[in-house]
């Protein structure tokens, strides 16, 4: 009977091992599956962010548009790596943990089989004890009962050895798989984050190089209704440049007016040769006028 009780304690240890594995591996599977799903949802949200960044960039000034598009492209690359992360987690971590349930079920079946053999041995021992108490002189019946007990003990011993091998193999495989699952998990995470850091570094540089002053100039120009940048200060020259004089000569009209003004001191635009050229921005285009004591005289073809 002591051997039977010893085997019973052994079985309880085996059952606890399997039950503990079933409990925690089930929780690992559930949590890692949830982790993978949340990672996939994070990828989806980031894809939406990429789309919004592109839409926003298309509505902005050129400098910001180029920066936002570059940033969106880098963010999209990170999501490609995240997609690979999700697929690898499912393949190398979650799915193997799901399949572990079948192995646990098989080990439980082996333990159940052993317990059946053990119970049979215990019953034969109990019958033998009762027979010895009721009919101590019936040696034939007692001998047959002892034979049955011996057979049950042999079956129980053989089954015990098989079960020990099964549970030992189960424990070894469990520890090996546990190591592999989490090594794969960490490797997948390291690969993703290494790639992500590389791409995010590029994204940071893209954002850091953004020249907001150029966009501010464009914005201020739009606020003033101007679609370019022109120098609105008076030119330093006291006489028109050759290109302007050539234009004046081709038109002819202003040249005559200037000549008359110089000949006639009473002419309203006479300034005795002291003329300066002003540059104005009119309706989005540069226009020139000659400035003197008499006021402003616009070039032909231009009007304020």
UniProtKB/Swiss-Prot annotation:
Function: May play a role in ciliogenesis. In cooperation with CBY1 may facilitate ciliogenesis likely by the recruitment and fusion of endosomal vesicles at distal appendages during early stages of ciliogenesis.
Effect ascribed to mutating residue 132 to E: Abolishes ability to induce membrane remodeling in the presence of CBY1
Annotated region described as BAR-like, given as residue ranges: 6-217
Location relative to the cell: Cytoplasm, Cytoskeleton, Microtubule organizing center, Centrosome, Centriole; Cytoplasm, Cytoskeleton, Cilium basal body
Gene of this entry: CIBAR2
Primary location recorded for the protein, binned into one broad class: cytoplasm
UniProt domain comment: The BAR-like domain displays limited similarity to other BAR domains.
Complex and partners: Homodimer (via BAR-like domain). Heterodimer (via BAR-like domain) with FAM92A. Interacts with CBY1.
Pfam families hit by this protein: FAM92
Statement: the UniProt record of this protein carries the keyword Cytoplasm: yes
Tissue: Restricted to certain tissues, most prominently expressed in multicilaited tissues.
Domain of life: Eukaryota
UniProt GO BP: cilium assembly
Keywords: Cell projection, Cilium biogenesis/degradation, Cytoplasm, Cytoskeleton
Family recorded in the similarity comment: Belongs to the CIBAR family.
PANTHER family named among the record's database cross-references: CBY1-INTERACTING BAR DOMAIN-CONTAINING PROTEIN 2, CBY1-INTERACTING BAR DOMAIN-CONTAINING PROTEIN HOMOLOG
Provenance organism: Homo sapiens (Human)
One cellular component term from this protein's GO annotations in UniProt: centriole
Protein name: CBY1-interacting BAR domain-containing protein 2
CDD domains for the chain: BAR_FAM92
């Amino acid at each position: 009977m002591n051997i039977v009780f010893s085997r019973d304690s052994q079985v309880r240890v085996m059952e606890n091992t399997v039950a503990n594995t079933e409990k925690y591996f089930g929780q690992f599977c559930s949590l890692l599956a949830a982790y993978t799903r949340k990672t996939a949802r994070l990828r989806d949200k980031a894809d939406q962010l990429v789309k919004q960044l592109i839409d926003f960039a298309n509505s902005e000034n050129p400098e910001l548009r180029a920066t936002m598009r570059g940033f969106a492209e880098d963010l999209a690359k990170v999501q490609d790596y995240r997609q690979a992360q999700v697929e690898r987690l499912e393949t190398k971590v979650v799915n193997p943990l799901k399949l572990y349930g079948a192995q646990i079920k098989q080990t439980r079946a082996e333990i159940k089989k052993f317990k059946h053999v053990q119970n049979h041995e215990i019953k034969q021992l109990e019958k033998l004890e009762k027979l010895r108490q009721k009919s101590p002189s019936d040696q034939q019946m007692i001998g047959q009962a002892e034979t049955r007990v011996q057979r049950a003990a042999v079956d129980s011993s053989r089954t015990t050895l098989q079960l020990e091998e099964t549970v030992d193999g189960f424990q070894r495989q469990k520890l090996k798989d546990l190591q592999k699952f989490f090594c794969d998990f960490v490797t997948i995470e390291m690969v993703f984050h290494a790639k992500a850091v590389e791409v995010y570094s590029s994204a940071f540089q893209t954002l850091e190089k953004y020249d907001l002053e150029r966009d501010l100039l464009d914005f201020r120009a739009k606020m003033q209704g101007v679609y370019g940048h022109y120098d609105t200060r008076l030119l330093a020259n006291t006489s028109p440049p050759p290109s302007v004089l050539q234009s004046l000569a081709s038109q002819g009209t202003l040249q005559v007016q200037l000549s008359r003004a110089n000949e006639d001191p009473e002419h309203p635009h006479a300034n005795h040769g002291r003329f300066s050229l002003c540059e104005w921005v009119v309706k989005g285009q540069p226009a020139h006028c000659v400035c003197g004591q008499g006021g402003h005289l616009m070039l032909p073809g231009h009007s304020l």
